[in-house]
Design a protein with these regions (language model features):
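Membrane-proximal helix-turn-helix segments that form the acceptor-binding/catalytic region
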Residues: 115-135, 144, 148-149
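Short alpha-helical donor nucleotide-sugar binding micro-motif in glycosyltransferases
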Residues: 246-247, 254-259
């Protein structure tokens, strides 16, 4: 089988999945990078040395031509954020395509009233709704958004982004976490308004007032950093809070491996939320906003983590307090989360299932997975969690 994966650039979100494809297919797999990465993303640690399976289409006319040939000749094309012209001929031939997509309407359904975007939605999606094209959903809200656009109904499959599978055993992770005295709560991400780190600090302050003992570690940088540090002082959290600054993805993962609880507070502007994936894989007890695209796929409330209502201080306090007053639940949730990620939500499983499902589809057969990557998406709306 030959699979070609088109996306704007090769980065740490895709590297492990691509390596898994290469392990399965060897020379049958190619990643086509269609543009150079922006400098600010490279500085954030997103950039990766290009393995031999990466074709940079923008480097030369010859590479561009090769990419166009792969788009037509491959058995399967996975199509992320890339110029649509690469798949025009493939669409006309009705050959198998998986469109790799976050939710298209995360800013709201009003987007369909903007003429430029309405034209784009029609050209890229609605007119192709009956073609041999399926959605790899990098958001639990994908299916409902595309249903609103009358596109890909019944053809959306659970997917996401797949950083490296955790290499340590849960026992090894628990040993690292048990060194924390008191419990350590980690928040990691860019300090942007949409990430709502302020909500976490406010909820943490309330829990501290109630007598719970813990420390806080804040990883990241960004435009809200000054405000958050001032808020930390105002809420009398400075003595238990450490700001680590910007860390690489690998260094952030190391902090997750040592944390007891991980809190993710983003609003609906968060497309996926890879930190949820990484923290669950690291055996943390994760408390996640219901708005993040990854949450409904990866977090089963009370089983593999806790979910709180996005933007609700009271809901977040309740989720935090539930763990702080029963510390034994922290390892219990962390273990179940770790096991779920090891068995289902990892690059090897995701790549293997795409290959297997593609083999079925190419023979006009159906392959059904009950859970995990490539299981069917439900229609989930913003108000699903109360």
């Amino acid at each position: 089988m030959k699979i070609s994966f088109f996306s704007n650039y090769f980065n740490h979100h895709q590297e492990a999945l691509c390596n898994a494809f290469y392990q399965w297919l060897n020379e049958g797999f190619t990643f086509i990078e269609t543009e150079p990465m922006e400098e600010f993303r490279s500085q954030m640690g997103w950039g990766r040395p290009a393995p031999g399976y990466v074709l940079k289409s923008y480097l030369s006319p010859e590479n561009e031509k090769k990419a166009e040939e792969l788009a037509m000749e491959s058995d399967v094309v996975i199509f992320g954020t890339a110029p649509e012209h690469f798949i025009e001929k493939r669409l006309e031939a009705n050959k198998l395509i998986f469109r790799y997509s976050e939710r298209p309407l995360k800013e709201g359904r009003i987007k369909v009233l903007i003429p430029r975007l309405a034209k784009k939605f029609y050209h890229n999606h609605f007119r192709n709704r009956n073609k041999n094209i399926h959605i790899l959903a990098a958001s639990a809200y994908c299916a409902s958004d595309y249903k609103f656009l009358h596109s890909y109904i019944g053809k959306c499959y659970k997917f996401g982004y797949f950083p490296e599978k955790e290499g340590k055993s849960f026992e090894e992770l628990a040993e690292l976490k048990n060194e924390n005295k008191p419990l350590k709560i980690l928040w990691a991400g860019r300090f942007l308004k949409l990430k709502r780190a302020d909500l976490f600090l406010s909820a943490a302050a309330e829990c501290r007032k109630k007598g719970y003992d813990f420390t806080i570690e804040m990883v990241g940088s960004g435009e809200e950093e000054g405000h958050l540090k001032s808020l930390t002082e105002k809420l009398s959290l400075s003595d238990i809070t450490e700001y680590k600054g910007f860390l690489s993805p690998e260094e952030t993962r190391e902090r997750m491996e040592r944390a007891d609880i991980f809190v993710m507070t983003s609003n609906f502007l968060e497309g996926w939320g890879s930190v949820i994936y990484e923290a669950l894989s690291s055996g943390c007890a994760v408390i996640a906003s219901h708005a993040a695209g990854a949450t409904p796929f990866l977090v089963e409330d009370g089983v593999t983590g806790r979910i709180f209502k996005s933007g609700s201080r009271e809901s977040l306090i309740s989720a935090l307090e539930a763990l702080l007053k029963e510390p034994e639940k922290i390892r219990e949730l962390g273990k179940k989360a770790y096991d779920n990620m090891q068995e289902y939500w990892n690059p090897d499983t995701a790549a293997g299932r795409i290959i297997e499902m593609s083999e079925y589809m190419l023979e006009n057969k159906e392959k059904i997975y009950e859970k995990g990557p490539l299981s069917k998406c439900e229609y989930l709306y913003n108000n699903w969690f109360n």
